[in-house]
């Protein structure tokens, strides 16, 4: 680890991790690479949570983000009604590969202060329609990560399936939470991302997926050229797939890629 990342805690003892990754927390095997998918939380697996916090901080810091703390763990990870952690674990490597944190929103809606439980409520205003008609059937997703050693640029063989493995886990959530109809969350784009590429990406999303009902609105809207007339003219009238190809080329020409959660 470089000196710039030396503030991050060392790896958690593997014996402690294995002791907490018990069969009752195993959800399924992945379709590729035969990895394991677990659901854990701070209360039933504190050592696994600590390793997740270490890997999140390492991953985000190496991408230009990070909290600057020894672990990326906040009060929503440790609260009484805490976020659960969906993780992919490689038995072959004895490593946690990737993860999401998630909260079944129906768990907190009976609390008058339910918005304090939701990470996204810090960033967005929710309409009554969204709260009443969507949240009871929604899982909030956040903190999506793939540790650096399993990203395609570092490990082409295993990295190609890292996100695919994690999405196997999302499929499992649909099975285990039968009332859920929606996944919801935010995508982080760091300030280092090329602004022209960012503006094109946001214009693309607004063009094909407008929030005409005002379900969710940002508390601090990003100031950017929403009209982005030149790019909109390029995609206007195109089918989604063709417009996406154009977007991908536009972004690549600026030495960026479309974020995996949008790809």
Question: For each of these PLM feature ranges, what is it?
Answer:
Residues 102-106:
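Acetyl-CoA-dependent GNAT
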Residues 7, 11, 42-53, 96, ...:
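Generic detection of long, well-ordered alpha-helical segments
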Residues 77-87, 110, 263:
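A short helix-loop-beta-strand connector motif used in the catalytic cores of GNAT acetyltransferases and
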Residues 29-74, 85-101:
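Short amphipathic alpha-helix that is part of the acyltransferase structural core
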Residues 2-43:
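Conserved N-terminal entry element of GNAT/NAT acetyltransferase domains
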Residues 50, 54-61, 168, 172-175, ...:
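A broad, structural surface signal
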Residues 69-82, 191-193:
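Beta-rich nucleic-acid/ligand-interaction surfaces
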Residues 107-262:
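Acyl-donor binding region in acyl/amide transferases
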